[in-house]
């Protein structure tokens, strides 16, 4: 992304992306090559390294007061839980930590991360994402999350994770403002946009 013009909007760029990003290890079928549950053959860090910049992260927060460690990456529901390359459960923390590591090493790049609950607690997912954003915002200038209110330019998005979400935040259960966070930092709510069109 280093060669992209700084003043272009991130939304004007066609980014390579992956569907059901965490499913490299999900093989519930007899023959892996014909698996209907595994949408990827590369693990998350491999996808980053080959140029993928837009990710579909499907989550299962198993409790309402979840942290990123408590949120499993899944395909559909917990039956198809994703694993890392070592066979360990793949968590939102793994994805976010790898994203920060990558952006620290490649500050001209940007990551667009669509987060969706496929199973479990939506409140828990919002809290987990919120705790990550809060930790990043506390870093000041080295924050790796886009915290603007509009779609960022390429320059503004460099070195940042730009969240998009497909879930509502029920502020009666978890209010980002209680943590001094702006709900916009969780990303545009595509789930709400889709519902308005129906």
Language-model features: locations:
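Short, surface-exposed beta-edge/turn micro-motifs
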Residues: 110, 158-161
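Acidic, His- and aromatic-enriched active-site or binding-groove loops in soluble protein domains
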Residues: 132-149, 154
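C-terminal active-site rim and adjoining tail of enzyme catalytic domains
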Residues: 164-198
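Well-ordered, non-membrane alpha-helical segments in soluble/globular domains
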Residues: 89-99, 124-135
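Active-site groove signature of glycoside hydrolases
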Residues: 61, 106-121
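A substrate-binding/cap region within the structured catalytic cores of diverse enzymes
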Residues: 148-151, 155-158, 165-168
